[in-house]
Amino acid sequence: MNIRPLHDRVIVERQEVESKSAGGIVLTGSAAEKSTRGKVLAVGKGRILENGSVQPLDVKVGDTVIFAESYGTKTEKIDGKEVLILAEHDILAIVE
């Protein structure tokens, strides 16, 4: 992938959510919402602080993350893949 996010931006590929319940029922509509989990494909150099220094990001390439789908979430198609461009503050957790 040939993309480099700037500053505190992160490129995430959404992971597919299971479309069946634990009991085997196929979920549709709002019950089968888009996943808010994904794999980090690229990260920016960090957040620029008021004093001009750069604070590195906590997430790294390859991390699986849980993110908030917010107004600022940008979806792009890059190399045939649909990816999200998020600010690091939209990432809620790293799955370990």
UniProtKB/Swiss-Prot annotation:
For this entry, list what GO says about its biological process: chaperone cofactor-dependent protein refolding
Give compartment(s): Cytoplasm
**Which InterPro entries does the entry mention?**
Chaperonin_GroES, Chaperonin_GroES_sf, Chaprnonin_Cpn10_CS, GroES-like_sf
Keywords attached to this Swiss-Prot or TrEMBL record, sorted alphabetically, are: Chaperone, Cytoplasm
Chaperone as UniProt keyword:
yes
UniProt lists the family membership as follows: Belongs to the GroES chaperonin family.
Quote the protein name from its UniProt record. Co-chaperonin GroES 1
Q: Which organism is it from?
A: Vibrio cholerae serotype O1 (strain ATCC 39315 / El Tor Inaba N16961)
